[in-house]
């Protein structure tokens, strides 16, 4: 937090000194030149300039100053327009035919170019990239290049992947290029669509980001469609890890821009060592009873101690007040109760080894490297008896909304966007366009089955699975937690139904690709959390090519992958033993001896050429991936592996095609939902695993009035229905019930929309501040000459001191020049020649005195710079850069903490009929002014006081007072408290 003008900065170290205060009267500080006033504003994605480094996991980085304002910044409306709202209501009936008609002309042009592209050699096709890039850089618009670029990508895809993009996929690419959201149904090939506009926009040389929702999809898509841009010569091995913000394609855009947008992106650093209080608080929470000692609001995710809870907790802890700032027990106790009641094992987190790992509620996946903040993660660790890791502090924070709004051109694709079109248009200015399907969708979505109690619901789910299993129809069961999936698995084991479980547990995550590959087989039953909800392509009859790859992988990897060296493994746990062994039941048949021999020969050649156990796993996976695709290959090992792969896939395909026909006759994939999600979109994502590309399929949801969504958000109507229906194992059919359930789900959607909107509005306050700070930091980081910036700091600091100690409105006769000189010399001992008479002679008015002090501030800086540079050339520049960056980083971190406290506090002001958001803006702005002033004061003060050992003697010869040094830094920094108490003449506070 920025320090006040009447107190010394906290914990100032000699090697990183902070400026002393100016005056107790100074409340309004000047912003650095160029800063603007006015309003200032809670995974897996990496940038992809379409090359080998295309792991698409989101890495947060501050934006450069050049893109922080101006035309690239989208103006945002807080609420949806009526047109956007009506669009969201009526768009569901749009089949995309209007979009087909609008794009028909361009599609025809691309189709006419197909014969020309097919006639080109591989090198000739690659050369088209150079030609197109040159035309783009010469000023030709990307719109005019689109037909030829799309034709090039279509031909490359045919050669490399064996897939020819359909006309509707070309239309999807055009929608994305226009900066809109393309709603495309499941199985329509969204991943391949993304390559079309990504290639086109990469021709400008400004880079493209492709974003997806998790590591599994990022890795899969990079290995698969990433071959197309690599084949066409778009590589970025030596490029920056994160390119500038130019064009971004977001896969599953509704998940990232809406579902994930309730939580900000936070970069945190390690703070203090954990306290033993977490363990003690966990024991207290275990002893306290719900509704007696505390109440729980599951909707708001908050807990509140009752009067008895306060008294009993204080008695156990032997303290007088839980909120005593010297002890701060309240935070520990409340977090411990939250961990007990609201954060449940195998629902919100899992235990792996001695770690508590968060499970993403939207994807069902473990969020590696993520931790809850504000001591909550430590409270969960204490509850589970795990070692408590260090507390964290926020170093940087940005909302998803503001992060993605940095892109001048943003687009996305998903199967479920129309219901949220109003929010997309109001926040992101993104229009939702329905793309027509390649084949009609014939999936049958059956009506929901509702029970009073969860016991009846789960019994009915088991009966449904058993019924469909007997017909041979593959079944995908969607659950909302690890706990539910394990419980259902136990029930299916009891009735003897073979099945697979896909959830966040490590043993299941490692088999994810294997499980998904066989989920569409005849009679298969798969229980999955939301991990199988997005991006999962379930092929009826099984995926023969993927099974062939798994067979080749289990033979190759153990022989060519280097074993994990002990030096790279954490001392806390042994390296995991990896065998790549696959359950034989996944394969549709036993591999013939001929193909087994062919694969063995290929593996032996790989060992001989690459070396036995000599490759890191990632490199071996990449080589195998390339061998299993259709791109041009001249390497002998790749050719041999590909030959084995194709023969194995051919053998498997005979059986999977036969099985596919049986599955189609049985009715296709049947999806069973076990709980309504917070949004209809997520329900539709689960349903969308069935009925891809015109395949048959069906879906049905089994619900209970005790489900979380209805229990927490259902209100009095659901409670009344629960009392009215007393039979637990009979389904309830009622129009009133259906209406009540729909209303509860709408309540949830509106509730979470309000959360996202509030987060966005509060982050908007921070956004302008973030832009200004990052611009200042980037300016210091990239500049080789910081003289002009330091001079600016010096002049503004002189202005601040003058205003704080004299004031622009005070008559010259009342100026306390002794006090002013004392403060100036406290900042800079090089100003030791100042006297009251000198100041009076140089400035009869406030403006003249201000000009003279600015001149002396510049001269003092240049004098210090000359002395240091004379003895150590280049040292002053390095010192200036270090001091600016370190002060910005430290004070910005403290500023974020201060703003968090303000945001928590302003909510109470609503009771006084004051708008919390306006209060937050005002206080946040004042805190920001204080911080920016403190940065420049600290920097210029540190530079004035900077005294390396080697220049000390030279300064003494120049008549400046000698100062003791410590480790090359001055330890003579004046302490305002001690100086003022011992020397009234030098004490602004004492004289005040």
Could you describe each region identified by the protein language model?
Residues 33-37, 50, 65, 69-71, ...:
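Feature targets compositionally biased, intrinsically disordered low-complexity regions
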Residues 27-28, 35-39:
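Q-rich, low-complexity intrinsically disordered regions
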Residues 2-15, 23, 29-32, 48-726, ...:
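Conserved P-loop NTPase motor core
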Residues 349-357, 363-369, 631, 664, ...:
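Extended, charged helical/alpha-beta scaffold domains that provide interaction surfaces
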Residues 37-41, 54, 69, 182, ...:
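Polar low-complexity intrinsically disordered regions enriched in Ser/Thr and small residues
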Residues 8, 37-40, 58-62, 955, ...:
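Acidic/serine- and proline-rich intrinsically disordered regions
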């Amino acid at each position: 937090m920025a320090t006040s003008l009447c107190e010394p900065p906290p914990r100032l170290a000699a090697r990183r000194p902070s400026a002393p205060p100016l005056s107790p009267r100074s409340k309004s500080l000047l912003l650095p030149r160029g800063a603007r006033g006015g309003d200032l504003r809670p995974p897996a994605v990496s940038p992809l300039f379409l090359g080998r480094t295309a792991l698409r996991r989101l890495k947060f980085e501050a934006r450069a100053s050049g893109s922080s304002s101006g035309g690239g910044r989208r103006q945002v409306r807080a609420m949806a327009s009526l047109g956007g709202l009506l669009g969201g209501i009526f768009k569901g009936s749009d089949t995309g035919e209007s979009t087909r008609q609008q794009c028909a002309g361009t599609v025809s042009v691309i189709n006419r170019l197909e014969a020309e592209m097919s006639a080109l050699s591989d090198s000739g096709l690659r050369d088209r990239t150079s030609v197109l890039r040159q035309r783009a850089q010469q000023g030709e618009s990307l719109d005019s290049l689109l037909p030829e670029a799309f034709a090039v990508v279509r031909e490359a895809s045919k050669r490399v992947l064996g897939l020819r993009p359909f006309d509707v996929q070309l239309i999807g690419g055009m929608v994305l290029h226009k900066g809109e959201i393309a709603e495309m149904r499941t199985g329509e090939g969204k991943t391949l669509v993304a390559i079309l506009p990504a290639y086109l926009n990469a021709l400008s040389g400004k880079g493209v980001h492709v974003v997806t929702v998790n590591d599994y999809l990022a890795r899969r898509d990079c290995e698969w469609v990433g071959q197309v841009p690599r084949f066409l010569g778009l590589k970025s091995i030596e490029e920056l890890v994160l390119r500038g913000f130019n064009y971004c394609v977001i896969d599953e855009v509704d998940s990232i821009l809406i579902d994930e947008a309730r939580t900000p992106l936070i970069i945190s650093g390690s703070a203090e060592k954990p306290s033993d209080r977490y363990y003690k608080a966990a024991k207290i929470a275990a002893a306290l009873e719900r509704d007696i000692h505390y109440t729980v609001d599951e909707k708001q995710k908050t807990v509140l101690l009752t009067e008895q809870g306060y008294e009993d907790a204080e008695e156990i802890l032997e303290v007088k007040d839980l909120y005593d700032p010297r002890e701060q027990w309240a935070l520990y106790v409340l977090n411990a109760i939250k961990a007990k009641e609201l954060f449940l094992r195998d629902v919100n987190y899992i235990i792996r080894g001695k770690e508590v790992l968060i499970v993403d509620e939207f994807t069902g996946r473990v969020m590696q490297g993520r931790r809850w903040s504000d001591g909550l993660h430590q409270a969960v660790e204490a509850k589970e008896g795990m070692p408590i890791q260090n507390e964290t502090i926020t170093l940087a924070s940005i909302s998803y909304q503001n992060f993605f709004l940095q892109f001048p051109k943003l687009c996305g694709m998903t199967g479920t966007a129309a219901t949220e079109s109003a929010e997309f248009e109001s926040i992101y200015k993104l229009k939702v366009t329905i793309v027509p399907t390649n084949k009609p969708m014939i999936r049958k979505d059956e009506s929901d089955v509702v029970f009073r109690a969860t016991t009846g619901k789960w019994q009915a789910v088991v009966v449904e699975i058993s019924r469909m299993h007997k017909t041979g129809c593959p079944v995908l069961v969607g659950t909302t937690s690890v706990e539910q999936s394990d419980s259902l698995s136990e029930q299916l084991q009891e009735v003897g139904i073979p099945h697979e479980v896909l959830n966040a547990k490590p043993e299941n995550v490692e088999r994810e690709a294997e499980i998904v590959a066989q989920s569409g087989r005849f009679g298969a039953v798969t229980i999955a959390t939301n991990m199988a909800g997005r991006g999962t392509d379930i092929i009826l009859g099984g995926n023969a090519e993927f099974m062939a790859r798994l067979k080749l992988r289990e033979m190759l990897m153990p022989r060519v992958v280097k074993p994990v060296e002990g030096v790279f493994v954490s001392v806390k746990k042994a390296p995991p033993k990896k065998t790549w062994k696959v359950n034989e039941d996944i394969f549709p048949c036993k591999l013939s001896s001929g193909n087994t021999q062919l694969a063995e020969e290929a593996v032996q050649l790989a060992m001989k050429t690459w070396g036995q156990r000599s490759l890191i796993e990632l490199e071996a996976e990449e080589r195998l991936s390339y061998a299993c695709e259709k791109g041009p290959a001249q390497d002998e090992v790749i050719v041999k592996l590909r030959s084995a792969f194709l023969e194995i896939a051919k053998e498997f395909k005979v059986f999977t095609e036969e099985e596919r026909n049986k599955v189609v006759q049985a009715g296709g994939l049947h999806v069973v939902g076990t709980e309504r999600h917070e949004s209809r979109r997520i329900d539709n994502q689960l349903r969308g695993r069935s009925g891809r590309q015109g395949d048959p399929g069906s879906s049905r949801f089994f619900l209970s009035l005790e489900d979380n969504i209805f229990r927490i958000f259902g209100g009095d109507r659901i409670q009344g229905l629960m009392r009215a229906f007393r039979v637990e194992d009979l389904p309830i059919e009622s129009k009133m019930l259906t209406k009540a359930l729909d209303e509860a789900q709408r309540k949830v959607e509106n509730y979470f929309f309000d959360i996202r909107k509030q987060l966005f509005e509060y982050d908007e306050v921070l956004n302008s501040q973030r832009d200004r700070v990052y611009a200042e930091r980037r300016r210091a980081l990239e500049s080789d000459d910081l003289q002009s910036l330091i001079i600016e700091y010096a002049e503004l600091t002189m202005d601040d001191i003058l205003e704080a100690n004299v004031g622009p409105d005070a008559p010259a006769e009342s100026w306390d020049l002794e006090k002013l000189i004392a403060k100036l010399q406290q900042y800079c001992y090089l100003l030791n020649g100042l006297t009251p008479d000198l100041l009076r002679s140089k400035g009869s008015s406030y403006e003249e005195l201000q000009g003279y002090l600015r001149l002396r501030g510049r001269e003092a800086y240049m004098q210090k710079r000359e002395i240091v540079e004379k003895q150590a050339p280049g040292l002053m520049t390095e010192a200036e850069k270090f001091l600016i960056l370190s002060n910005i980083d430290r004070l910005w971190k403290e500023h974020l903490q201060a703003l968090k406290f303000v945001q928590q506090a302003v909510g109470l002001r609503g009771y006084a009929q004051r708008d919390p958001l306006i209060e937050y803006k005002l206080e946040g702005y004042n805190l920001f002014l204080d911080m920016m002033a403190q940065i420049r004061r600290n920097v210029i003060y540190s530079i004035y006081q900077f005294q390396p050992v080697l220049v000390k003697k030279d300064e003494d010869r120049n008549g400046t007072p000698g100062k003791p040094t410590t480790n090359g830094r001055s330890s003579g920094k004046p302490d305002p408290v001690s100086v003022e108490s011992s020397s009234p003449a030098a004490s602004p506070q004492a004289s005040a």
